[in-house]
């Protein structure tokens, strides 16, 4: 009986870590759903709201590497619990704040604690499960997390409307604390899988070298230029864009936006398959960037789009947003195996920082061009031109990123094997 229980414990750890990975997506995307309520309650302008949205990415990016190091150095259950606790406290601060500065602190804490999400899943997977199961378990965790993102849009809006966002957030905080407590209390006697053990946590010179590696920094910069479709548009601006520009109702706008995350569930496997089929990861990255640019040109400059068309475009956008999987594969091929996880974390930090940059830039531009028109709730109403001026930065940055990758691939002659290497976090 005890042996059977011992075998189940790693599965339980993995399940609850994956559940938190989905949970943090729900908290992350809630700001976009509550945009009007937040602007009205705190009497802030769009620039301040853009700052609020971007604080999540600052916290997430800033803690990505420190949490990764702590997961290796200390008991991963304790590190995961503390990180989840930070997320929960940030959620409570976010919902109870009566001052905008406290709201910023709560959002920052949510981002910082959420950085443990996928890292803890990867740690549990590599610690307790055979190598042959790593890819499928990490893939399932990622898909599960994206299902949380899908739930965070339309279903969460329904919950907010029915119960109020205060009660809903308190409930989410309680659920998050419960997840963390269960992870902390699960004791596992299952022996760790024998893996190549490399201690990069104490090698400060290696960390410094990776941060100063021009190729990695260039890849991180170029990848960051292409994240605007997801972290800049879908996370916060898609819903008001569809509502005000294409006159979709609130439910249709929410559903269309959520399809980005549905598309991402399929995007990783599809792009990897195409990259292996064409024997060129480089080409698929370029194609994905071009397609994202085309999608935004259609969204911005078509005179009329219906619900079905916007839904299809957002689903396709989600597929092409998974170009990052191929970038991480390239990164892992450029460094020694023992450094791959830290190298990927370095590039991911840069990518996540661009989430803040896009939010800040777009909010400044759209506010600058705004004509002062507001609705009955005193929330700004933007024209098509306002949105075009702000959101155009996304396809422009995509083009710059594509050109940069073409230059990098040509200069470095990066060649990858036809099969995708497993990337560990």
Located regions from the model:
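Cytoplasmic membrane-interface "Motif A"-like loop-to-helix N-cap segments
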Residues: 73-83, 276-290
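Conserved MFS/SLC helix-loop-helix module at the cytosolic interface between two early adjacent transmembrane helices
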Residues: 62-101
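Cytoplasmic helix-loop-helix junction between adjacent transmembrane helices
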Residues: 106-144
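Juxtamembrane intracellular "pre-TM" segments in multi-pass secondary transporters
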Residues: 2-7, 190-220, 422-425
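Extracytoplasmic gate region of multi-pass secondary transporters
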Residues: 31-33, 214-271, 355-363
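Helix-breaking motifs and short loop linkers at transmembrane-helix boundaries and internal kinks
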Residues: 43, 75, 96-102, 130, ...
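Paired small-residue
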Residues: 90, 101-109, 308-316
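Helix-loop-helix hairpin linking two adjacent transmembrane segments in secondary transporters
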Residues: 140-189
């Amino acid at each position: 009986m005890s042996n059977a229980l011992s075998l189940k414990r790693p599965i339980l750890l993995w399940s609850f870590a994956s559940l938190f990975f989905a949970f943090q997506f729900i908290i992350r995307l809630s700001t976009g759903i509550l945009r009007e309520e937040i602007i009205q309650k705190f009497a802030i302008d769009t620039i301040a709201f853009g700052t609020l949205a971007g604080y999540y990415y600052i916290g997430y990016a800033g803690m990505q590497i420190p949490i990764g190091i702590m997961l290796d150095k200390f008991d991963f259950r304790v590190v995961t619990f503390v990180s989840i606790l930070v997320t929960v406290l940030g959620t409570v601060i976010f919902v109870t704040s009566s001052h905008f500065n406290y709201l910023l602190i709560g959002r920052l804490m949510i981002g910082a604690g959420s950085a443990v999400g996928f890292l803890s899943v990867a740690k549990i997977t590599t610690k307790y499960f055979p190598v042959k199961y790593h890819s499928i378990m990490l893939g399932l965790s990622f898909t599960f997390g994206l299902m949380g993102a899908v739930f965070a849009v339309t279903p969460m809006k329904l919950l907010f409307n029915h119960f109020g966002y205060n009660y809903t957030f308190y409930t989410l905080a309680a659920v998050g604390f419960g997840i963390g407590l269960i992870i902390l209390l699960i004791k596992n006697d299952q022996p760790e899988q024998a893996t190549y053990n490399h201690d990069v946590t104490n090698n400060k010179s290696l960390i410094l070298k990776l941060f100063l590696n021009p190729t990695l920094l260039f890849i991180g910069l170029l990848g960051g230029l292409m994240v605007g479709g997801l972290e800049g548009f879908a996370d916060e601006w898609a819903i008001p864009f569809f509502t005000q520009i294409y006159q979709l109702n609130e439910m249709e706008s929410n559903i269309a936006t959520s399809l980005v995350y549905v598309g991402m569930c399929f995007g990783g496997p599809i792009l990897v398959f195409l990259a292996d089929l064409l024997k060129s990861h480089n080409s698929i990255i370029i194609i994905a960037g071009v397609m994202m640019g085309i999608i935004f040109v259609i969204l911005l400059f078509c005179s009329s789009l219906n619900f079905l068309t916007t839904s299809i475009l957002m689903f396709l956008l989600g597929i092409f947003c998974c170009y990052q999987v191929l970038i991480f594969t390239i990164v892992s091929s450029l460094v020694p195996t023992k450094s791959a996880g830290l190298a990927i974390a370095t590039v991911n930090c840069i990518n996540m920082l661009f989430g803040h940059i896009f939010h800040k830039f777009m909010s400044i531009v759209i506010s600058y061009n705004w004509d002062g028109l507001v609705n009955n709730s005193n929330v700004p109403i933007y024209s098509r031109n306002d949105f075009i001026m702000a959101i155009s930065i996304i396809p422009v940055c995509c083009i710059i990123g594509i050109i940069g990758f073409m230059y990098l691939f040509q200069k470095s002659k990066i060649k990858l094997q036809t099969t995708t290497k497993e990337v560990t976090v």
